[in-house]
Design a protein with these regions (language model features):
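Nucleotide-sugar donor-binding/catalytic module of glycosyltransferases
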Residues: 1-227
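C-terminal subregions of glycosyltransferases and related glycan-biosynthesis enzymes
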Residues: 191-194, 198, 202-319
Length: 319
């Protein structure tokens, strides 16, 4: 990021909100401040990731647009200039969607501490398969470009006009003690953007300018629960905001078509969170009429039976 920000000068404001970390964040910031201007803020306590997002956007940021990046995320060459160009070319549009590719966090760890986007030249798996840049007439139409469940849940996907964002973010009531138990406390950024953008035009940047690393998140083990509790509620939110019914159905179908493994984990290997907030009975009652849901259920059962059979065979051979 440092060379890219240095290239554009004062067009970009970089803010680091240190959520009371115990690592070397402050030392890294001091190093980077030799080359670019960075505002550094440290929370006195760990306020949770969601609240930290809102501290950045609603209290610290002074620019016209905001782009949230996590501490593990990397950006590829020309990411900053491409976003700036999209903003300048489309002055009346409030939102830019940025595509990203996925890498395992273990691949990043193999390369040491000092890594950049250039260390991952292969694009890998993409969030959205559409790689051309264009304007969509309605933000929610981006749903058609992805076969990945949980589109829009990554903070890195969204570049947004802060004045419009703050109108909606002010309505979000965060409760750290309720983290991951409600849609707003799990994906407050998505709730904010959806209420801000449903039915409105957006810029779509199809090239994966961001590299998102998966597997290191402290909530990763509860991802199956989040998928089948909160991500399904995102489709409900879209419907409440009068999104096209076909797009709402597409969002749900994408989840069911590509989440059999996660469903199997949720059903056969429950976690404390899933026991607390997930109901299989309610899920089946609501979605059994959808062919994609029924197929996912059968695939999940087959996966479990297959693994059980293989495990039994291996134990028999070892004997």
């Amino acid at each position: 990021m440092v060379p890219q920000v240095h290239q554009v000068g004062d067009q970009v404001e970089v803010i680091v909100s240190d959520n009371c970390s115990t690592d070397e964040t402050s030392e890294v910031v001091r190093w980077a401040q030799q080359y670019i201007s960075i505002r550094y803020h440290r929370n006195s306590t760990n306020v949770g990731s969601a609240a930290n997002y809102f501290i950045l956007t609603d209290e610290l940021a002074r620019g016209e647009f905001g782009w949230l990046l996590g501490d593990d995320d990397l950006i590829r060459e020309n990411a900053v200039t491409s976003v700036l160009d999209a903003i300048q070319t489309n002055p009346t549009i409030d939102y830019i969607f940025v595509n990203h590719s996925y890498e395992l966090i273990t691949e990043r760890e193999k390369k040491g501490d000092l890594v950049t986007g250039a260390d991952f030249p292969k694009l890998g798996d993409l969030l959205c398969y559409e790689t051309q840049n264009h304007v969509v007439l309605r933000w929610e139409e981006i749903v058609r470009f992805s076969r990945t469940p949980a589109l829009f849940t990554s903070i890195v996907s969204s570049v947004f006009r802060l004045s419009r964002w703050k109108v909606e973010s002010a309505k979000i009531k965060l409760d750290r003690d309720d983290s991951f138990r409600s849609l707003e406390n799990t994906f407050p950024h998505l709730c904010t953007v959806a209420r801000m953008m449903i039915g409105k035009p957006a810029v779509y940047l199809g090239y994966p300018y961001v590299i998102l690393f998966v597997g290191g998140q402290n909530w990763f083990g509860d991802w199956p629960t989040m998928l089948f509790v909160h991500v399904l509620k995102i489709a409900d939110l879209f419907a409440e905001l009068a999104a096209d019914k076909q797009l709402v159905a597409c969002y749900r179908n994408t989840l069911f078509e590509h989440s059999a493994w996660q469903f199997r984990q949720l059903i056969f290997y429950p976690t404390p969170l899933s026991r607390d907030i997930f109901s299989l009975r309610k899920l089946v009652a609501r979605y059994w009429n959808m062919p994609t849901f029924r197929k996912m259920c059968w695939v999940a059962i087959k996966l479990q039976l297959s693994e059980s059979w293989i495990g039994s065979l291996e134990r028999a051979i070892l004997k």
